[in-house]
C-alpha cells in the first residue's frame, strides 16, 4: 500500500498528516478552519484517499499560513506515498459540476512543478476562509508533490460551489492519475524517470 506520514512544525504552524493513496475515502480533518476542513474531507472522499490532517496555526492572524502549510505537507505526503511511480496512469482530467459551477482539473504526475489556476472568485471569504487561499493551497500542493496542475472555472458564480467543485475534481483527477495500470511496465515516461 502506498502510505505516508508527514510532520511539519514552524513558528506559524504545526501540522501532521497521514495518507493512504489506496484507501477508501476515510478522513479525519482538523485544521481549525471549518470550510477548509469541509473541502479537504471532500478531496479525500472523492479521491478515495484515507487522509488524516491535524493542523494548529496562527489563525489569530488569518488562515493563510495554515492553508498554505497544509498544502506543503499534503504535497510532501503524496510525493512520499507515490513512491517510484511505476505503472501509474500519470495523466488525468476531470470535470466536476456543482450546481451552476463547472470546474476542470488536469493533472500530470510529471516531477515538474507547475500550477495554472483560473478561478475567479467573487466572494472574499466563505465562512472564516479567505478565498484567495485556494490558489495558495493548490500552488503549495503542486510544487511540493512535483506535479503539473491546471485548474479552470468553465462557468459559475457562487464561490462556495466553485471551490467545492475544485476540491472534488482534484481528488478525482489524482485518484485516476495515481492508479496503477496493470498493462504498463515501469515508469510512464520515455525518459525513464518522473
From Swiss-Prot:
It comes from the Bacteria. It is an enzyme of class 4 (lyase). InterPro entries: IGPD_sf (IPR038494), ImidazoleglycerolP_deHydtase (IPR000807), ImidazoleglycerP_deHydtase_CS (IPR020565), Ribosomal_Su5_D2-typ_SF (IPR020568). One of its GO terms (molecular function) is imidazoleglycerol-phosphate dehydratase activity. Gene3D superfamilies: Imidazole glycerol phosphate dehydratase, domain 1. Disulfide bonds: none annotated. The keyword Lyase applies. GO terms for biological process: L-histidine biosynthetic process. GO terms for cellular component: cytoplasm. SUPFAM superfamilies: Ribosomal protein S5 domain 2-like (SSF54211). Belongs to the imidazoleglycerol-phosphate dehydratase family. This is Imidazoleglycerol-phosphate dehydratase. The lineage of its organism: Bacteria, Bacillati, Bacillota, Clostridia, Thermoanaerobacterales. The gene is hisB.
Amino acid at each position: 500500500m502506498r502510505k505516508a506520514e508527514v510532520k511539519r512544525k514552524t513558528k506559524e504552524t504545526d501540522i501532521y498528516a497521514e495518507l493512504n493513496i489506496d484507501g477508501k475515502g476515510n478522513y479525519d480533518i482538523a485544521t481549525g478552519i471549518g470550510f477548509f476542513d469541509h473541502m479537504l474531507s471532500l478531496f479525500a472522499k472523492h479521491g478515495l484517499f484515507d487522509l488524516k490532517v491535524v493542523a494548529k496555526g496562527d489563525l489569530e492572524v488569518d488562515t493563510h499560513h495554515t492553508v498554505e502549510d497544509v498544502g506543503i505537507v499534503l504535497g510532501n505526503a503524496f510525493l512520499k506515498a507515490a513512491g517510484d511511480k511505476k505503472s501509474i496512469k500519470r495523466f488525468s482530467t476531470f470535470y466536476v459540476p456543482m450546481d451552476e459551477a463547472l470546474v476542470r482539473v488536469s493533472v500530470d504526475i510529471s516531477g515538474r512543478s507547475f500550477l495554472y489556476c483560473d478561478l475567479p472568485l467573487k466572494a472574499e471569504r466563505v465562512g472564516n476562509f479567505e478565498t484567495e487561499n485556494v490558489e495558495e493551497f493548490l500552488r503549495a500542493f503542486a510544487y511540493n508533490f512535483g506535479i503539473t496542475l491546471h485548474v479552470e472555472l468553465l462557468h459559475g458564480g457562487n464561490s462556495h460551489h466553485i471551490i467545492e467543485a475544485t476540491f472534488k475534481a482534484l481528488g478525482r483527477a489524482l485518484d485516476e492519475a495515481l492508479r496503477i495500470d496493470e498493462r504498463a511496465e515501469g515508469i510512464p515516461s520515455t525518459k525513464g524517470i518522473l
